[in-house]
From Swiss-Prot:
The active site is at residues 136, 460. One of its GO terms (biological process) is root hair elongation. One of its GO terms (cellular component) is Golgi membrane. Belongs to the glycosyltransferase 2 family. Plant cellulose synthase-like B subfamily. This is Cellulose synthase-like protein B5. Pfam families: Cellulose_synt (PF03552). Keywords: Cell wall biogenesis/degradation, Glycosyltransferase, Golgi apparatus, Membrane, Transferase, Transmembrane, Transmembrane helix. It is a multi-pass membrane protein. Its EC number is 2.4.1.-. GO terms for molecular function: cellulose synthase (UDP-forming) activity. Expressed in young seedlings, primarily in the vascular tissue. Expressed in the root cap. Its main location: Golgi. It comes from Arabidopsis thaliana. The keyword DNA damage does not apply.
């Protein structure tokens, strides 16, 4: 409850980041793009079909920049004031935390354990928290790991709170050696904690290779004769906070769940697991707010829950319409600098409109909104209107929407009416929780239209569109240090496959019933917010990106002109130079190096001509009914923690492990053929150009192709440098012969086509 007599200082404040200088730069680049288009239109009759292709590509790039400029026009973010929250709010609301995992091979249990430990140790009343771990692979190893983690957290959570530890994921905290200190008690506790964590890691590692413990413990009987895609519902209360005394009261509820899966039933991948988490948590604790994080995304800021509550508890009409609070994804490894920059720019941009997208992790949701409420269903005081009461709370409507579980229906009514459930023993609710996990439970209900949305492998964007279409807003908080930090796949197939899934899911959203296109005719989504979701269509840029990467080579081989001659060439030079300097400044302003900027520019081109290109193929095959789109789990890893007796060079607490920046891993997947083909074509064109220069240093030939086109080829080769390096590397960093031979065959065909014309 808030103290009305306290200061009127807000719990959070929306800060605008408008910059007239950046607006001027954006508009200047846009003006240069359209001046180039105008030049091509005026001179199109003097040139061949190459100019038509160039005009098409540059029109697409201009449209993308126009939309991006609109989205960046009024950037903003919410700044929470935790001290004000601590002063004014004495009875904090409850929170249910969701951690989904699905594959113990690609998502190691110790990764999930670290995420869970970081959540259980946040600075928030333990009796107000509950952590639910969904295991879609029904692995006894995951359950075993959580049982061991529940023992460790009883000493870990008190240790973190006693010494105000900031990074509460043990693997990350213990990467650094013990700093010399005069506090002998802390040193003793630190060494003891690290020993216990190393023991925990060894137990999980030993259990991975030896399953004898499965037969020795009756608690694992439910896992006998189970398969990842064929098993019954399992709900296990790993730890229940019953108050108690001492350190035990510092540990929130911890529940393991695995929904029923059968081969002949749709299970909707991660989206179905999230809806099961929503139902089970509604039955057991029914907190008004939920948090979901991926199993590798640990809480890096112990006050993150309080930061989100500053937005939800802000006493204003506008905050009553905030459906979710989204924190940006930040990573400690690999190639994801481009995500950090994109989220910083696009996240703040849409925060100034209707709010950021839900990005699938690091997000706090309002339970009532996930149950299907629209913003118009609420009165100014936050209560449900009479019209909405008749619509939502009628008995037949409740069963039709939420299923035939009486216990769940009652919990839904309580959540919609903002009633707190009386505390019950979690063990007494296991049977009801198992019921809502049956694979047929959602049949002929509204699940998938409420909760997390189905019909797309990108459940985050799909759900986000549905929420904004109902008139809700969302909040963007980007604290320093980051609230959540995770790992990503290494550069190569894992990264490209992940980007392919994201791109495919984004395009799916634009063709299903939650499409922002439909929001033009119904729904309460703002125009610029629709443009933000149309940004998902940038995946379609793969076609003009591919064409534009080949055009300079085509012109050199065909002896024709791609770029204007004389003074008009300055437009393109200015445009390219200005865009490069602008993007470089954006990277460096966020603390990234020039090398990181170059790697990201290269990666964008590789993703555009591989992941995005194949995502279009996936969508076409789905629309034709030829194949369905699967959900591919990216493999995640964390650095190994050494024992307390092993030494390591000292590094600051904020240091993070760095992978080989820009080092690309290849295999025989067809995803690498386009990039290899582009690189070989441009090398062939440059070789032909050099031969022609030797033969005639004074003439470029009839069409006038020359230095500008050669510079274009050099730029493309620089952007696809990982593929050039792959020709000379060994092992996993080398392009396989099968991929190279296919790309070489396509290159020969392309060269003959150009020369023949």
């Amino acid at each position: 409850m808030a103290d009305s007599s306290s200061s009127l200082h807000p719990l959070c404040e929306r800060i605008s980041h408008k910059s007239y200088v950046l607006r001027a730069v954006d508009l200047t680049i846009l003006g240069l793009l359209y001046s180039l288009l105008l030049y091509r239109i005026l001179h199109i009759s003097e040139n061949d079909n190459v100019w038509l292709l160039a005009f098409f590509c540059e029109s697409c790039f201009s449209l993308v920049w126009l939309i991006f400029t609109c989205l960046k026009w009024s950037p903003a973010e919410d700044i929470p004031y935790i001290n004000t929250l601590n002063e004014r709010v004495h009875d904090l609301p409850s929170l249910d935390m969701f951690v989904p995992t699905a594959d113990t091979v690609r998502e190691s249990p110790i990764i999930t354990v670290n995420t869970v430990l970081s959540l259980l140790a946040v600075n928030y009343p333990a009796n107000k928290l509950a952590c639910y771990v969904s295991d879609d692979g029904c692995s006894p190893l995951t359950y075993f790991s959580l049982k061991e983690a529940s023992k460790f957290v009883k000493i870990w959570a008190p240790f973190c709170k006693k010494y105000n530890v900031r990074v509460r994921a043990p693997f990350r905290y213990f990467l650094n050696p013990l700093v010399a200190t005069d506090d002998s008690v802390f040193s003793k506790d630190w060494k003891m904690m690290k020993r216990e964590y190393v023991k925990l890691c060894r137990k999980v590692e030993d259990a991975t290779g030896d399953s004898h413990w499965l037969d020795a413990d009756d608690d694992f009987e439910a896992f006998s004769n189970t398969k990842p895609n064929d098993h019954s519902t399992i709900v296990k209360v790993v730890w229940e906070n019953k108050g108690g005394v001492g350190d035990e009261k510092e540990v929130p509820h911890l529940v393991y769940i695995s929904r029923e899966k059968r081969p002949n039933y749709l299970h909707h991948y991660k989206t179905g697991a999230m809806n099961f988490l929503l139902r089970v948590s509604g039955l057991m604790t029914n907190a008004p707010y939920t948090l979901n994080v991926d199993c590798d995304m640990y809480a890096n800021e112990p006050d993150v829950v309080r930061q989100a509550m500053c937005v939800f508890l802000q006493n204003s009409k506008n905050s009553n319409h905030c459906a979710f609070v989204q924190f940006p994804q930040k990573f400690y490894d690999s190639y994801t600098n481009e995500l950090a920059v994109l989220q910083s720019i696009l996240g703040r941009g849409v925060a100034g409109i209707q709010g950021p997208f839900y990005i699938g992790t690091g997000c706090f949701h309002t339970r009532r909104v996930m149950y299907g409420l629209s913003s118009d269903d609420l009165e100014d005081n936050g209560n449900i209107s009479q019209v909405a009461t008749r619509e939502f709370l009628a008995e037949d409507s409740l069963v039709r929407k939420y299923g035939n579980s009486k216990e769940l229906v009652k919990s839904v009514v309580d959540a919609l009416q903002r009633k707190s459930n009386p505390q019950k023993s979690l063990a007494n609710l296991i049977e009801a929780a198992q019921e809502v996990g049956h694979c047929h439970y959602e049949y002929q209900t509204s699940w998938g239209n409420l909760g997390w949305m189905y019909d797309s492998v990108a459940e985050d964007i799909n759900t986000s569109v549905g929420i904004h279409l109902r008139g809700w807003t969302s909040s963007f908080i980007s604290p320093d240090p980051p609230a959540f930090i995770g790992s990503t796949p290494t550069l190569g197939l894992e990264a490209i496959v992940q980007q392919r899934r994201w791109a495919t899911g984004a395009i799916e959203v634009l063709f299903n019933k939650q499409s922002p296109f439909m929001g033009m005719f119904h729904g309460k989504i703002k125009f610029r917010q629709r443009l933000a979701y149309f940004w998902a269509l940038m995946c379609l840029r793969s076609i003009p990106e591919l064409i534009y990467c080949l055009l300079p080579a085509y012109c050199l081989l065909h002896d024709s002109a791609l770029f204007p001659k004389g003074p008009c060439l300055c437009t393109i030079v200015t445009l390219v130079g200005m865009h490069c300097l602008y993007s470089l400044w954006q990277f460096m302003s966020l603390g990234f190096s020039v090398q990181s900027w170059y790697v990201v520019q290269s990666l964008w081109r590789i993703i555009a001509t591989s992941s995005w290109l194949f995502s279009i193929q996936d969508i076409i095959l789905k629309l034709l009914g030829i194949s369905q789109i699967g959900f591919v789990i990216a493999k995640k890893t964390i650095p190994e923690t050494k024992s307390v007796y092993e030494s390591k060079p000292s590094q600051g607490e904020d240091d993070v492990p760095k992978l080989n920046l820009g080092k690309f891993e290849f295999d025989s997947s067809g995803l690498f053929i386009p990039g290899t083909f582009i690189m070989l074509v441009n090398l062939a064109a440059l070789a032909g150009y050099l031969v022609r220069l030797q033969r005639s240093s004074c003439s470029h030939g009839g069409g006038g192709s020359g230095l500008a086109e050669a510079c274009g080829c050099i730029l493309v080769v620089m952007l696809f440098l990982p593929f050039l390096k792959g020709l000379f590397e060994h092992g996993k960093y080398s392009i396989p012969l099968s991929t190279l031979s296919k790309a070489a065959f396509l290159t020969v065909l392309f060269v003959f086509f150009c020369v023949g014309k």
